[in-house]
């Protein structure tokens, strides 16, 4: 049980272990707010779950530097231990393969790492690509010209770049060739030196 007091929060429980877990979870959540992070139900549940599983120490690995600053000044950081491991893998390996449910930040964090590498001049350009269709679909059955057909499939990549760079920054980098977004089918025979390459939705690729 939690009780609000004049000097803080009092935690009362039958088991000392449970009380300690509750205190650890509350202290970490307070630390997150002090860093300016926004709390939501998903974040609170994650912290409680990690503490309850005896992994409270791993939460402190998330306190590191941000990956990237968005065009609106928002810092992008790992919010879970899985995301932290993902970012560490990208930073230390030539190729990283990420598998996970939709909405877990795979594309967004990869784009953040790419933008950070471009800003730091570690790479000369960012190439983002994905299969132009979902598994079992054909472009020929979709209305419009080729660009209008493939744009909906590339929208998650556009959204992530707009968040990181803003519309003006995105347009400027595209015009000078520093950012390229294209269907995977257009990548055959390309020279990809000094590039940060992200292949999104790779599970929809075919042997061809």
Range-by-range predicted roles:
Residues 206-207:
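Conserved D-loop-proximal element of ABC-family nucleotide-binding domains
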